Amino acid sequence: MGNFVFDKRVAQVFPDMINRSVPAYSTIVDMIGLLASQYAIPGSNCYDLGCSLGATSLAIQNGTTGRNCRVIAVDNSEAMLDQFKSQVSEHENIEFQLADIREVEFVDCSFVALNFTLQFLPLEDRPVLLKKIHDAILPGGCLVLSEKVCFKDPLEGQFHDSLHAQFKRANGYSDLEIAQKRSALENVLLREPRESHQSHLGQAGFSRSYTWFQCFNFVSLIAFRD
């Protein structure tokens, strides 16, 4: 089985796949909309980096209703963006960018979401992108960073990985399917400990970061530029 690719085939099954694979994914998406309602600055831009089929983009849009914010949805998969576009009416205040998130030029942004996206970048590229995002965010704005993490304590890692595998079995995946997906993602999704992510955020210039969600080995952080 080859490496995992976000192609047309994956785009067609993505909502089902991610909800069966990521615990509380829909809750995370909904809460990102809530966070946007709290922290997006009126009249600014909100970026969803690695937007896939746009669930997070739409949650941000809903959370910023009446604030004159524009949501900029970025993905490097044309298949993903095309399917997202087909589900959105023209009047909705969403701009689509087919681009590598490392190449995005951020403008007037106060809210950025990296919802299970950073983990697909090479390790050496992550601090550079976080620094670029920090420097572009308006004071008072924030970054939401969701990641599948690993753990410094091997026993803790085994605990969470085992529970995650059981979660997928409960959602209809066979042990063979779980093993095949793990193999496909092995060289594509590169996990880091939560502490490393928080260290990267601090080094990028974010004044503070908090864990607002965790289920098994899935974590979401919010980092502020004060």
Segments from the language model and where they lie:
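Conserved alpha-helix/loop element of class I SAM-dependent methyltransferases that forms part
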Residues: A24-P42
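Class I SAM-dependent methyltransferase Rossmann-like catalytic core
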Residues: M1-F4, K8-I28
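Short alpha-helix
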Residues: N187-A204
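Class I SAM-dependent methyltransferase SAM/SAH-binding core
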Residues: Y47, S52-E103
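A conserved beta-strand element that flanks and buttresses the S-adenosyl-L-methionine
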Residues: A113
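A short glycine-rich, Lys/Arg-flanked "PGG" loop and its adjoining helix->strand segment in the class I
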Residues: P127-P139
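Core SAM-dependent methyltransferase catalytic element
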Residues: A204-D226
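Conserved class I S-adenosyl-L-methionine
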Residues: V144-A170
